[in-house]
C-alpha cells in the first residue's frame, strides 16, 4: 500500500472517532515546505480559525516554513485565533501523521496557547 494512502486511511479512522465527540477539531496538514492548522466545526461545516506558514506576515518573518520552530509558531497563532472566537476545547486531528516533530511542536504550542485537548 502506498504510504500516503495508508496515512489517509488512518486519518479517516481518527476523524470517525473524533466526530462522535461533538467538539471542534484542530486539523493539521504538513507538506514538504509548509504546515497548516485549522479549527473546524464539523456540525456546521465551518472553519472557525486557521493559521499556516503561507500567510503573508508570517512568510516574511520566517525563513523556512517546514521546521519545528515554524510549527510552534503556527500552533500559538491558531490557539490565539480559536480563543478569540470562543473555542477553548478541541479534538486533535493529526491527519494520520505520527505524533512527532512538527506535529508534536504544533500541538504543544497550541496547548501552551490555551487550547485543551
Swiss-Prot record:
The keyword ATP-binding does not apply. Signal peptide: none annotated. Coiled coil: none annotated. Pfam families: Ribosomal_L18p. GO terms for molecular function: 5S rRNA binding; structural constituent of ribosome. One of its GO terms (cellular component) is cytosolic large ribosomal subunit. One of its GO terms (biological process) is translation. InterPro entries: Ribosomal_uL18_bac-type, Ribosomal_uL18_bac/euk. Keywords: Ribonucleoprotein, Ribosomal protein, RNA-binding, rRNA-binding. The keyword Acetylation does not apply. This is one of the proteins that bind and probably mediate the attachment of the 5S RNA into the large ribosomal subunit, where it forms part of the central protuberance. Part of the 50S ribosomal subunit; part of the 5S rRNA/L5/L18/L25 subcomplex. Contacts the 5S and 23S rRNAs. Belongs to the universal ribosomal protein uL18 family. This is Large ribosomal subunit protein uL18.
Amino acid at each position: 500500500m502506498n504510504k500516503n494512502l495508508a496515512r489517509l486511511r488512518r486519518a479517516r479512522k481518527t476523524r470517525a472517532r473524533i466526530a462522535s465527540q461533538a467538539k471542534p477539531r484542530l486539523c493539521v496538514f504538513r507538506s514538504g515546505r509548509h504546515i497548516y492548522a485549522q479549527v473546524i466545526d464539523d456540525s456546521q461545516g465551518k472553519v472557525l480559525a486557521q493559521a499556516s506558514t503561507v500567510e503573508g506576515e508570517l512568510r516574511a518573518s520566517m525563513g523556512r516554513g517546514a521546521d519545528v520552530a515554524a510549527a510552534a509558531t503556527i500552533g500559538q497563532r491558531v490557539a490565539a485565533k480559536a480563543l478569540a472566537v470562543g473555542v477553548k476545547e478541541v479534538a486533535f486531528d493529526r491527519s494520520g501523521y505520527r505524533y512527532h516533530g512538527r506535529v508534536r511542536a504544533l500541538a504543544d504550542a497550541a496547548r501552551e496557547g490555551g487550547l485543551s485537548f
